[in-house]
Amino acid sequence: MTVKTTVSTKDIDEAFLRLKDIVKETPLQLDHYLSQKYDCKVYLKREDLQWVRSFKLRGAYNAISVLSDEAKSKGITCASAGNHAQGVAYTAKKLNLNAVIFMPVTTPLQKVNQVKFFGNSNVEVVLTGDTFDHCLAEALTYTSEHQMNFIDPFNNVHTISGQGTLAKEMLEQAKSDNVNFDYLFAAIGGGGLISGISTYFKTYSPTTKIIGVEPSGASSMYESVVVNNQVVTLPNIDKFVDGASVARVGDITFEIAKENVDDYVQVDEGAVCSTILDMYSKQAIVAEPAGALSVSALENYKDHIKGKTVVCVISGGNNDINRMKEIEERSLLYEEMKHYFILNFPQRPGALREFVNDVLGPQDDITKFEYLKKSSQNTGTVIIGIQLKDHDDLIQLKQRVNHFDPSNIYINENKMLYSLLI
């Protein structure tokens, strides 16, 4: 049997009919804060408000619903960092199917619990592997051994068609408001979302520039399409943006993206964190890291989008509240507002007071202080974190630190030390 490897607008239209009573029609909102910030009209497609708080339900339900009754009776499997798993779990419960869901051991607990909640007794969750790609290998082996049906999170035409219904829905909403998009920004993980959206836009909104956004530590589509002109596997990835951290994109999504995507933007994970905090404080939007990617990319494109009409897909809102401290930390480091040093402190009374008086600026704050006292020596090693009010104060801070201890180590510039100590 020939496996279908292309997606058409007809496929997306058919998927739209399957999903119309299953998924929520999520809002397309004009965002006044971002519009003012970038001197353009910025619309947000709020898939973070979907039933499972991400767009993944669209692709999962469509891919499962087209299975034959015989195939459904054998059960389904999937591998996912979280959101696709929730879509599969929701569908399994809705259609009363048995599902075994494989998730990386690094998946935030909030996402694991949500999968169990949506799937209830229809779902078994297996945590395995440090990355999605390791998890995928385990899932495929299990699927083959148990003759079940693997629901691919992105490299499947039915999954892609389901994700493409987001574009059809969005364009219908825009048409009713007489809105035409000049730019569309959407996250890329494995490529299912950008493939589905771009397929529909290239036919029904061909003048819209499609911009794919990846975390800089996992830019597998950019490396495949732009750098190598073939699908490549990244040897190492930063897993922080867990919903978009994939070492290898799909063969199908690669071909579609290569044809349809106009440009790629890589966003630093720290910038994503700043966007998450900004969206929460300014717009009351709770976006997960992958969900904030599209908005993060606007800063890279600010000169191009001025005076234009832009839409950003907020792809998910499954953010674990326990990660907020790390998100704030990464944001402060990216904004050059928090700095860490290793210093030698004199082991005598008053040394800390001297440091505060001589080194700290009037608006600086100590956020971390660990003092290892060595009784046989005159000095002890101190790990100290300092938060600035203005990142422009860094040069003077470094000068004062160097005067206090010329042998100090600036941890921010040493990734290995930072990962070990902070």
Swiss-Prot record:
Metabolic or biological pathway, per its Swiss-Prot or TrEMBL entry: Amino-acid biosynthesis; L-isoleucine biosynthesis; 2-oxobutanoate from L-threonine: step 1/1
N6-(pyridoxal phosphate)lysine PTM sites in chain numbering: 56
Single Gene Ontology BP annotation: threonine catabolic process
Bridged cysteine pairs (disulfide): none
Enzyme Commission number: 4.3.1.19
Positions with a binding annotation for pyridoxal 5'-phosphate: 83, 189-193, 315
GO MF entry, a single one: pyridoxal phosphate binding
Keyword Transferase recorded: no
Keyword Lipoprotein: no
Coiled-coil intervals, chain numbering: none
Binding partners and assembly: Homotetramer.
Family statement: Belongs to the serine/threonine dehydratase family.
Protein name: L-threonine dehydratase biosynthetic IlvA
